[in-house]
Structures are given as structure tokens and as C-alpha cells.
């Protein structure tokens, strides 16, 4: 199958998933933990979840960029969400994972403490973002999801990084291939 056909097929599947969500009034999320909080991102932005592997540090990279890693022959910039959210540092554990996401036509990895689950959340259970949550900039948030006694912080991946930061991470990855 050609790349064009694959791309068209993926776009058709993406539209189908979005239409399904509109019809079912649910949002499908990948949820994970960073520090003591549980976060969620839209499943359509997640490419895959991998184990934390060797990371190569890059000189003069932004402080929240942990470095780069090899993902099947491609250079993957890796961001530590703890650093991005100005949370206390913690050693990575066997539960630590890298959530590989697509943001603005760029693929990057997000280090998280643990994966919780893939879930469907009713849109009626999602509230707008509060002004501040434990030091996290409210611009990073799409909202708060309530499910039973759980609160999920729903991240807006398109706003977690400025255009300049995305450009810088692209340069880090592009310059290393």
C-alpha cells in the first residue's frame, strides 16, 4: 500500500472515529499518571505507548526536553512532563512509559509515571478548565473529566508547547537524523 493510500485510509479512519464520538457523545482517552495526578489525552493524538529506553541528552535543549531516543530508526524528541509541569523530580520506575504523540505534524514522546487505561468518557462528564491546577498553566488544559470519584485532567497537547518550542524540538530531532 502506498504512503498516499495509507494516509487517506488513516484520515478516513480518523474522521470515522470523530463521527462515532459525536454520535455516542463520548470521548476516548488514554489516561496516565504524573506525580499524584491522573491525566488524559485524546486517543487520536496517541501513536503508541512504549517502555522507557535509553535517552541521549542534547546540549542546549529546553530544560523539559529529556533528550532523544531511537524509535525504529527515527529520532524521537522526549519530554519529561514532570519538568514541563514544574513538578518535583523523581527517578523513573519500571512503570514509567513514553506516550508517543503527534502534535502539529511532529512526533514526540512524553515521559509519564504510569499508564492508567484507555477509556471512554461521556462528554457530559467534562467540565471547562479551572484557572489553576497545582501550578499547571490552564492554557495546557482542555478540561476536567469526572468519572465516579476520579478527576482526570484533560490535556490540550496542541497548547502544551509554544510554536517556538515545537520548532526547537523539530530542530533537535531533525538535526540528529
Question: Which residue ranges define each predicted feature?
Answer:
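An acidic, low-aromatic, low-complexity terminal/linker signal
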Residues: 1-177
Amino acid at each position: 500500500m502506498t504512503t498516499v493510500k495509507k494516509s487517506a485510509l488513516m484520515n478516513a479512519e480518523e474522521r470515522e472515529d470523530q463521527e462515532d464520538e459525536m454520535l455516542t457523545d463520548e470521548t476516548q482517552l488514554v489516561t496516565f499518571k504524573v506525580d499524584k495526578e491522573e491525566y488524559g489525552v485524546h486517543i487520536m493524538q496517541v501513536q503508541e505507548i512504549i517502555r522507557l529506553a535509553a535517552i541521549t541528552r542534547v546540549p542546549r535543549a529546553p530544560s523539559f526536553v529529556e533528550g532523544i531516543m531511537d524509535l525504529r530508526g527515527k529520532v524521537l524528541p522526549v519530554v519529561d512532563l514532570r519538568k514541563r509541569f514544574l513538578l518535583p523530580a523523581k527517578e523513573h520506575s519500571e512503570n514509567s512509559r513514553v506516550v508517543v504523540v503527534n502534535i502539529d505534524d511532529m512526533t514526540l514522546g512524553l515521559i509519564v509515571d504510569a499508564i492508567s487505561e484507555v477509556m471512554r468518557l461521556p462528554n457530559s462528564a467534562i467540565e471547562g478548565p479551572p484557572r489553576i491546577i497545582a501550578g499547571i498553566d490552564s492554557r495546557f488544559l482542555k478540561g476536567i473529566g469526572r468519572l465516579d470519584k476520579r478527576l482526570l485532567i484533560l490535556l490540550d497537547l496542541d497548547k502544551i508547547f509554544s510554536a517556538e518550542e515545537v520548532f526547537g524540538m523539530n530542530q533537535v530531532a531533525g538535526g540528529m537524523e
